[in-house]
Amino acid sequence: MFLLSVFFPLLGGLVNTSPIARFLGHRGSSIIAIGCMVVAFISSVVIYYEVVFMGCAVSVDVFGTWFSVGTFHAGWTFNFDLLTANMLFTVTGVSMAVHMYACDYMRQDPHLNLFLGYLSYFTGFMCVLVAADNLLVMLVGWEGIGVCSYLLIGYWSHRLSAVKSAQKAILVNRVSDGLLMWGVLWVWYHLGSLEYDLLNVYSASGFVGLSILIGAMGKSAQILFHVWLADAMEGPTPVSALIHAATLVTAGVYLLVRLHIHDEMFVIIVGSLTAFMAGVFGATQSDLKRVIAYSTCSQLGYMMVSLGLGETGGEASMGHLMTHASFKAALFLAAGMVISGNGGNQHIARYGGSAHSAMFTMLTLMVASLSLIGWPELSGFYSKETILNLAAICADPIADVAHTLLLLTAMLTSAYTTKLFYQCFMVDFSGSSVTPVRNVLPILAMAILLLDIMLKVWVGTNLLSGMLFFLPWGVKTLPFGLMVAGILTATAAVGSERFTLIRFCGSRWGFDQLFARSPVNPIFDLGRITWAIGDRGLLSVGNLRA
């Protein structure tokens, strides 16, 4: 039962990418993909019950010794502890909803079986990463989700923008992944083992901790490595939902929690700058999916700040990761319905007037948006408020600055989320009419999970009771006040040039231009020179001699 949650998504991917899939048709491929994900999710629920409620952590040796090099023996072992159980439940639950949604959303695509196969592989490798008991098996899942993200972002290969975005994502992650690999090799050289138990103390210091931290920054799109995240929206909407909710971008945060890497100063600085930067970018975007993408980047910044606040911060970070998975999946799936109903148009300034014709979509997007901004009695409120409270009580000047930046980010989040919702449904525009996708069950499930009542069912108590530790009245109420201020500001400024900040912010602070002019273009120029002088020259000389 424990292995089903890991291997069944991979099985679904194997079937749908094999020659057998051409005989299954769209219906057969959909049944295979959804069926495998349902089995994986049910297995994850059983694991969650056994580990969380019964306290039965399990370690499963799958293949024995994978390979041996001298005294080093690599084992293929999965460890199902509390952290793994929570992550598997989140990953398989969100992925099952995305698979159901994708079967309907992509029903006109001639290669639906291939798309579903890539989605299943994506989920399967994420489950391998989550359940891995050592760094070597973790790297298999880590590289697997990287390859799958490249295939899915560039799935519409007839679009040049999609191909370039896929290349950008894989190249940026190659830089951070290279440092992660170097750190793993360093650990193997000095310890002779890659087991997590030995790493929890060793990897938290020095070069190893920094290299693993930078590897996590790349996957989780932190500042300097964030440039690929918004461009990844060129892929189909189900891909965006899966990347942002439960798989790729959460892998970095999970790895840091797993290895207990909490370099307080560096992590807090990186997380707070990322959160604020992404908040500014989100407020200056007009593309629906890019606005949601920058909200993901911003929330990942919250999680990174929380990681720098000690062991309690690690727990708060994982709590926010789980709630974020639900409301971000609901946001993207509802956004997909809006986009499909507007003929593929993603420019929110051209939306509006569809509140009556798309009531279900409007309500779903509203609940998910309120959870994103941290409205009371929704799941996002509890997880975000916990992080803000931890930053407020931390006796460190850097934490005080981070707390201020997170508060400003909360205001920006409220502003651009209100702008998005208002432009989609409240502005009169006769050309907008959303046609709901037939399969609304996945979105409904994600929206229900955002309600506090469902959290009480799962946890067994009111989460608010665990948050009532003493804090000054102003500290507790300031986030809510800033959230309301952001909503009012956005409502007053929608449709006005005042809401469009300076062009510098709209161009994302010039990071793309900076990277293009400094490391990227010179490398491309060098490649063209070596091709012209070396490859083409040698080949032409060889042909003449022949």
From Swiss-Prot:
One BP annotation, GO: ATP synthesis coupled electron transport
Top-level lineage group: Eukaryota
Catalytic activity reported: a ubiquinone + NADH + 5 H(+)(in) = a ubiquinol + NAD(+) + 4 H(+)(out)
One GO molecular-function entry: NADH dehydrogenase (ubiquinone) activity
UniProt GO cellular component terms: mitochondrial inner membrane
Compartments, record wording: Mitochondrion inner membrane
Positions of transmembrane segments: 1-21, 31-51, 52-72, 82-102, 112-132, 135-155, 175-195, 198-218, 237-257, 264-284, 291-310, 321-341, 358-378, 387-407, 440-460, 468-488
Keyword Transmembrane: yes
Topology within the bilayer: Multi-pass membrane protein
UniProt KW GTP-binding keyword: no
Primary location group: mitochondrion
UniProt keyword annotations, A-Z: Electron transport, Membrane, Mitochondrion, Mitochondrion inner membrane, NAD, Respiratory chain, Translocase, Transmembrane, Transmembrane helix, Transport, Ubiquinone
Top-rank EC class of the record's enzyme: translocase
UniProt-listed Enzyme Commission number(s): 7.1.1.2
Family named by the database record: Belongs to the complex I subunit 5 family.
Function description: Core subunit of the mitochondrial membrane respiratory chain NADH dehydrogenase (Complex I) that is believed to belong to the minimal assembly required for catalysis. Complex I functions in the transfer of electrons from NADH to the respiratory chain. The immediate electron acceptor for the enzyme is believed to be ubiquinone.
Name listed for the protein in its UniProt record: NADH-ubiquinone oxidoreductase chain 5
Native organism: Chlamydomonas reinhardtii (Chlamydomonas smithii)
Lineage: Eukaryota, Viridiplantae, Chlorophyta, core chlorophytes, Chlorophyceae
